[in-house]
């Protein structure tokens, strides 16, 4: 139910506005279901690495599906870039726009391809339907196109500025084929792009149906109400905060090519009706692909504000207006062209963690949490299809341990913050690719000990069944960037990446590694970070310790040495 405003910025029909808001969300949910169910690549159909949104004719976000928070910046950026390049009067019914470039089209990294379709009513542009999907490969020297060690956007794959993919209903098949020919699996790319176009058609038809049912004036008035209400609701939350400045930082292990750690620092300043986020103090632009484009930075900030102040607030343009963001140009949080950005999700996660840390100075203990795994590790396996021309690219980002909360343990084996994708089921992996899952498990003792325990990390070990499989990975929190505990809680366990584990040929790999050619029967094991603990381990309730021991989440050694308890007495309690 819509809450009352603290000033005269009231709504004529709060209940109707709430119903309308949910109508918009139902349209985006239907669009997302279409995109997921009809797609061909495992990264979209199984892992759901995609998002959808609706914009008005002025480019304001009206509604976004509940998928990937990090996509919020790219979709907004794409919409802005389209309207900057194309005057509204030049856009025709049946046009389709495509883009992905962080510098030329306000994207976040090249694998995230935006498709935007105008929605007309009675001959006039009224809305846009948009979606974004992470394609498993867009070219470049490393399969997957997200390697942390690349040093230029020119090396990361095909760059697509704002481009008309269709004009007045006619798709430019030559352009579509040109884009797909620059990837390792043109057939899969082509099919997924066509699904993206179809998804927008479905969303456009739903918006036209809503206008037909309610009337155009009522729809436009309701859109204004929804955006205005979101803004006022966030202002109410800001008014509850203590004014002042709060600084926190997190760290990357390195800049993608080794070397020293890189700081990600934010200063949050609370004003009477504004939040200001200043990233001065963050490290200089990375040599590798760890750089965070400014629209991805904005998405990180919007996500954190929504998650911490009002998780149920509708994500639309009203959320953005009271928030100011500054990041010096030429730093890792606002890189200059042609800096590489393919591994930007690691940095986005760390930025979100830093913002959560800054809010610790504002929120009561029961509303803060320890740091989570905050790094979004990714693995990529590539090779030749056995049944058709081209190469397969299996890409997956992995979860880990979430940070412990005041009164509950951190969630185990989960994506945190900005990603929100699903795991690829073992059956799907082994059915699609010449790979075998040796192990997929949670790692005992990986969550930081505390009164409440950090979430457990994931171990995933995959074996090549044929020779010539090419492996790449990008991760973090192998050295300094671990999940920190709060209020006496211990840090979470570090991440690891190992080739041929538990064999005479075992080899520890660098966290950002690329193009390792595996022979048949060779394997790679990735261990993700655990979450930080909350409160001193000695304060942990015996019943929780007993349950952890029975579930295998902590070892007897940890119970004795870290928690300081006698195992037999805990088991019998």
Report residues per predicted region.
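Glycine/proline-enriched, intrinsically flexible loops and inter-domain linkers
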Residues: 2-93, 98-572
